[in-house]
Regions:
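Functionally constrained cores in energy, signaling, and assembly domains
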Residues: 4, 17, 354
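Sequence/structural signature of beta-propeller domains
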Residues: 31-417
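N-terminal processing/targeting junctions
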Residues: 13-17, 78
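Bacterial Sec-dependent N-terminal signal peptides
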Residues: 16-36
């Protein structure tokens, strides 16, 4: 009899544990009660771990990683059968830059190759093949961001959020949506947009998670950050950040919905030449900000933009100097470097509370990382870095370096100490 009672209690305990795991599968890493950090992260808080290569399937087609790597997000529940090596979860990312199809890959244990030998790096494995979720084949030089979030209020499952645009986007196009994590049956929903000046250039190139405790306290639970920097400053003379929460406007919001938003960072567009020119310190029109992440570790945090920064003189023309009729025409600087640009979350608090204007926050630190990169061949090389993603629980920062491995990117890994 006692054995039967013990068995019943054991079964009840195991059942409750299974239900908890099931219920939490879309909500892990939410850290709902975690305190809001009060200190800044510094460049000395980062340790370089190494890098890894991406899968080779589909080469020479749009279903490959070649010329890709400009959107990335971390999925903590991915790759459940992966190696027990401390690198838990998976990554969703975009491939070939013509169509930005989405794939899911494993995260192998990175290797720090002292001689930057690609053959020493492990290779990720494909978990989900590339799928054409966004249908961007008609876009000229597309721009895309993606971000995973666990299920939010009113949702029955976690979502993969996306934003998209193109280099020249003069109409008020729709820019945002979401889909399911199963890429073969994505159930894409959208599209929506953010109604702000120059929204087609300042809202739709990167997405990142806002920590729940911060979002709940300062921006009414708007947990998704979105933004874009468009070279030449059409978007604003520096990166931008808008907090959004599409799930608060329907499950899903109807097609064409104007998303409610909260501006956290926005500088003056160069198109608004008749207004006061508020810009980021040391701004160059040649700057590139391909990704952004809200980093946190213990009592320290920072909003970090990942990209390529101009130094010295800046001009419109080609690498040799100003010109209007020349090859490689665009914005150039004397030197370009791959960097991480740090903003203080407390400055965003002031904006959210109406105590500062969205153009007032300024970066407090910059971290140059070219010494870790594999493909830098000239001081004016563009596209040093692609997108970024963050494993908040373990403190791993994943940063893409494009065009390294037969035109495929590799992924570098840093750990916040």
């Amino acid at each position: 009899m006692k054995k039967n009672i013990l068995l019943i209690f054991l079964l009840i305990f195991l059942f409750s544990r299974c239900k908890n795991i099931e219920n939490n599968s879309d909500n892990e890493n939410d850290n709902e009660n975690s305190p809001i950090p009060t200190q800044r992260l510094s460049v000395n808080d980062f340790e370089y771990i190494g890098a890894f290569r991406l899968p080779v399937e589909g080469e020479e087609t749009v279903n490959s990683w070649q010329w890709g790597g400009f959107a990335l997000t971390y999925y903590p529940e991915g790759d459940k059968s992966g190696a027990n090596d401390g690198f838990i979860g998976s990554l969703f990312g975009t491939g070939h830059a013509w169509e930005y199809r989405i794939s899911e890959i494993s995260i192998p244990k990175p290797v720090n190759s002292k001689n930057k030998n690609l053959s020493e790096l492990p290779r990720a494995k494909t978990i989900q093949d590339f799928r054409d979720i966004l249908n961007l084949s008609d876009y000229e030089i597309p721009r895309v961001g993606i971000e995973y979030l666990p299920k939010q209020a009113g949702q029955s499952s976690a979502k993969l959020y996306f934003c998209f645009g193109q280099h020249y986007q003069e109409t008020s196009d729709l820019t945002h949506g979401w889909c399911e994590l199963n890429l073969s049956t994505p159930q894409k929903k959208g599209d929506w947009y953010i109604d702000t000046s120059h929204h087609e250039y300042c809202t739709n190139d990167y997405l990142f998670e806002i920590p729940k405790s911060w979002a709940d306290k300062y921006v009414d639970g708007y947990r998704l950050a979105t933004g874009r920097f468009r070279d030449g400053g059409w978007s604003g003379q520096g990166p931008s950040v808008f907090a959004i929460a599409p799930w608060k406007q329907g499950n899903p919001p109807s097609n064409g919905t104007k998303l409610n938003h909260k501006v956290l960072l926005k500088y003056t567009s160069t198109e608004d030449y008749d207004q006061p020119q508020h810009k980021m310190k040391n701004y160059h029109n040649s700057d590139e900000w391909q990704g952004a992440v809200w980093l946190s570790k213990g009592d320290k945090a920072a909003i970090v933009f990942v990209g390529t920064k101009g130094y010295g003189e800046c001009w419109y023309g080609n690498e040799d100097g100003p010109c209007l009729e020349c090859d490689n025409r665009g914005w150039w600087s004397t030197e370009l470097k791959g960097v991480l640009l740090f903003y203080d979350p407390s400055d965003f608090v002031k904006v959210a509370e109406g105590k500062s204007k969205p153009y007032e926050p300024q970066p407090y630190a910059i971290m140059e990382i070219d010494k870790y990169l594999y493909h830098i061949k000239s001081k004016q090389q563009k596209d040093h870095l692609g997108a970024a993603a963050f494993d908040r629980e373990r403190g791993y920062l994943y940063i893409i370096e494009p065009y390294v491995d037969d035109d495929k990117p590799i992924i570098h890994v840093f750990k916040i100490k």
